[in-house]
């Protein structure tokens, strides 16, 4: 009787191990398939592309008073995908997890002020560049910060996973040397700017497009000050899985069309007051 119970327990344990191993193997092959496979046939069958966005990132992708997705990137994505006979399904994502969301197949694209850089190019396949921006420091006029050197010993905020923070954290970065400490990280820029206004931060490292739009829509825009950084120009691109070669090529062709027919300039005029840059 005892021997029978032991054999029964061993069988249960053995079966459990087999199930776990099979699940791990299945998950591995599912991950590899999602990550490496060209999904164009599935995309055309669904007629929909899932686009990951940070829905607080004005004016690129955000929600209006009615809760609808709006913004420069949102309208550009819709116009571009329409050229391809597809629709966009916008999904809010944690910006610090954007590449993971893409790799695991939860989204098909990252399209939301996504700066192209060497680190990200290792993880995703970028479209051609469609917009350019740069990093700035936003502070309050009462902080008496007029140039980058005035940030010595100050409390600087930035968004987790943002291109500005990535550059700030690079070895030898001159701004980091000036500040002398890590940047305080936030999951969204609006939270950092709120802390700036109540005095918990001295400055925020942020995209110029975001800063300009945010400040212009504040009750007292004159209370803010913007200082240029020496980070250079950021080129925005659409991030896709490396295996999605066909999708990437189709996006590039459609982006070229919306540039040529003036659609992108109309969208840019709406959100920035200028033609696309």
Predicted regions located by residue number:
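Extracytoplasmic small-molecule ligand-binding "clamshell" domains
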Residues: 10-16, 36-113, 261
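Ligand-binding clefts/hinges and TM-proximal coupling segments of bilobed small-molecule sensing domains
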Residues: 21-38, 45, 163-183, 222-226, ...
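A structural signal for short loop-to-beta-strand junctions that line the ligand-binding cleft
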Residues: 40, 72-73, 121-130, 224-229, ...
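Periplasmic-binding protein-like
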Residues: 55, 132-139, 208, 212, ...
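Ligand-binding cleft/hinge of the Venus flytrap
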Residues: 63-64, 77-86, 164-186, 215-220
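Short helices/loops that flank or line small-molecule/ion binding pockets
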Residues: 83, 91-92, 96-109, 123-125, ...
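A ligand-binding cleft/hinge motif common to bilobed small-molecule-binding domains
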Residues: 97, 114-122, 169-170, 194-198, ...
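Flexible hinge/capping segments at coil-to-helix
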Residues: 139-156
